[in-house]
Amino acid sequence: MSTNAELFDRACRSIPGGVNSPVRAFRSVGGTPRFIQRAQGPYVWDAEGKQYIDYVGSWGPAILGHAHPEVVRAVQEAAVHGLSFGAPTEAEVELAEMLIARLPSLEQVRLVSSGTEATMTAIRLARGATGRHKIIKFEGCYHGHSDSLLVKAGSGLLTFGNPSSAGVPPEFVAHTLTLEFNNLAAVDAAFSQHGAEIACVIVEPVAGNMNLIKPAEGFLAGLRELCTRHGAVLIFDEVMTGFRVGPQGVQGLTGVRPDLTTLAKVIGGGMPVGAFGGRADLMAHIAPLGGVYQAGTLSGNPVAVAAGLATMRLIGEPGFYERLSAQTARLAQGLQERARAAGVPFSADAIGGMFGLYFGDRVPASFAEVSACDTEAFKRFFHAMLERGIHFAPSAFEAGFVSATHDDAVIDATLEAAEQVFATLRA
């Protein structure tokens, strides 16, 4: 049996940094990444056979818990009939119809293979439909790794403290206006100066890539009003929040309807599926109907779509989100209570099946506030919890995820471990 350290050393010889996505490398917390061998329900097991309660959840998709038998069965049955056709299938039509039925803002939807593809194409579509070039995004909001969006982005870029990425020419981001999240006045000012040039505003309606930051009261409604007034397209990036925080995502919780929505993660059930969709008049600009090009060899892959369909059916059962939200809130509140009892500056927040942990006295509301949290305290907390078999995201700037299989016993075990760890942090 290889150890995690042996596997990481081996990986570093053939894979840049030893990982296929930067945050997995443990660079911001130090130490050796855990190489996961298998997963079931709320648990993962590493290469050394150690079991962990998992709050990474594949970074969001594992809303049903790992390896749900009905999802696994759907994948197996689909694979028997072929892994990829490069042609339309009835299953992809069924998934599109299901997404449209669940999200009132979707009139038409196009399937892709990742969240990055979805957001990249949604922005291209907004530009093509409006004939404008500038876009507005927000500090700390991550919309995938396409060039024009790697400006003060969240996720791994926050982990490494980079405001942007090498390899992105200044000309590529010249049309990207980056503003403070939750600062509606700044958006109003940008529209006052550049209104006729702005194609779209793209936003994580609940930011999940600079930890978890909720929208301020009126922020999303204000974006909707400004976009409508100036003829810009409002894009909700619900790659992370879509069907994770509620049955209609953040747009269902707030009643704010975007023009376009991007989705991924949960809709693939752990397989690579993304989507973008919205108003039919906008979607009519996408090839083959219009001049905005988008294509993908594996878009609508039948095996991935089978996983998505099975997942979407299961999360549509009555009471699913009420139970998920209650368990997530119980975890967040329990952690906060135990930290404060130990005298550790700490706050927690939750929405649906997502939560945020902050080593500071209050829940942050912006990129600057989350950046001011105590990352050294988080490192100590992360490793102490990992030693006790609790697997949180290896970054102070990532949201956490609870699944339907995180029952009372799992939450209790997590809180018991946290109580021990907070006592050591105080010492």
Swiss-Prot record:
CDD domains: OAT_like
Signal peptide: none
Subunit-level organization: Homodimer.
A GO CC annotation given for this chain: cytoplasm
Protein name, entry field: Glutamate-1-semialdehyde 2,1-aminomutase
Gene field: hemL
Pfam families: Aminotran_3
Main enzyme class: isomerase
Organism whose genome encodes this protein: Bordetella bronchiseptica (strain ATCC BAA-588 / NCTC 13252 / RB50)
